[in-house]
Amino acid sequence: MLIRIKHKLLLIISAMIASMILVQAPLDADGRGQSRQDPLAKAFRADRNGWIYIHLEGGPDEIGYQHGYLLAREIDESLNVFKRYLPHTTKREWQFYRDSAHELFWKKIGDEYQKEIAGIARGAAARGVKIDADDVLAMNAWIELASYYVPSLRQARLADPEVHQSPPPSCSAFIATGSWTKNGAIVIGHNNWIDYLVGRRWNIIIDLKPAAGCRILMDSFPGFIHSGDDFYVTDAGLMITETTITQFKGFETEGLPEFYRIRKATQYSNSIDSWLKVMMDHPNGGYANDWLIGDRKSGEIARLENGIKNNIVERTRDGYYVGSNFPVHEKTIREETTFDAANTANSASARHRRWDELMKLNRGRIDITLAKKFEADHYDVVRKREAGSGNTLCGHVEVDELGLPEWDWTAYYPGGTVNAKVADSQLAERMSMWASTGHPCGGDFRLETFLKAHPEYTWQREIAGDMPSGAWTQFSITPRRLGEEVGVKPSLHPNDTDYEEAARRRRTGTNPTTTVPPRPPPQL
């Protein structure tokens, strides 16, 4: 009898141990006992009207991996563009950018964003892309390095205080509230100016749901942990955009990078005050901007001129702020730029005049419909004509015989507006925005037609391409089931198999120039 009782007890204990083993989470690669869940389970991608929409959710490792995996093709193509574009324009090879980004920024961005960046590299590498964390870091920092750090090195070498930066991403933006808008709430709009060979790839919409901090809806670029051209809506009620300060000079190697400050401020702020505090914390001067920010909860808007020596804030609940790459304050102009404020014919000043005209002409009427029209505006106040140019809010430098000398863009340079976004308080409350790819005026850029007329830019042929305009499209934060609800299965990529085969060939050196024509992407 005693033996049978002992036997039963042993069976019970064995069963209990077995059940504990079954429910215990298996060890992950690091042996930390975490669940081996599918890292893509909460993420998806869908393509719509020229935009690539991705939903990312989880901790920094997860959202990084999701990002890299879902945008592997686009990250690979963008990385290859930078490897050829930056040596041509800055005379510095990609390895310089990798080394500089790591030395200047890696330790400063903290554990969370280090993990996210490493995750992006791992996700893309899982799809066959030859990439590591330093590549992703350098991509995030390329504006700060190419347009601020490199000129600062030249300035130091030449001992010339007049050497200026010519930041490539330049924008036309506004924010208005109170008696200036149709219903008294905030309206915000922005379009992005940059070289078309880069800007045609600035077509990502990210619904970011991090494990900590605010949920963010933003436009972005492949591989970026931030928006880059900067248009954000957060579930804390903040609405954020900016325009770059033309001919800003100076770079502080000990300062905090802009891409880190804007991501941290946007993710962890629930008010204008808390957002400003992060943005003004040790700026390095890289990507120095005039920031426009609104709080839909209060209707208040603000502008931050975010330099190194000068951080000047204006706030109102009844008014507007506009941006077209002009430095606002005389002290900033004098101390931190080489900008000629007396020249009213340059692009920044001409667009500033046009913005003020549009605001005053439409006081009390500004809404989403007008915001879209503003961002597509083609009136040139210098030439006094209706035709896209380097002086119009919707920029077309490719047809401008003067180019943009203040940005070092020569005559007919293939650059200008590459996308546009607008939102108001009502949309922001629903975490939603309207966006269009390409020129918001509806004009298409056709590369071969352009190169026939301007063969001096033939060097861009291998890394550039057409940039068609897309219809204005509304985007919102969405659940994974969205695809099933509208009859489309969310895909990891519309051309998974062929892409991975092409990536394998590049890695092995067989047929390295092979390109895979994409199949038509799924449409929502």
Where are these regions (language model features)?
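Bacterial N-terminal signal peptides that target proteins for export
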Residues: 2-13
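Bacterial N-terminal signal peptides
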Residues: 12-21
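N-terminal mature-domain region immediately after signal-peptide cleavage
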Residues: 27-273, 280-286, 292-315, 344-524
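Extended amphipathic alpha-helical segments with heptad-repeat/coiled-coil character used for oligomerization
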Residues: 300-340
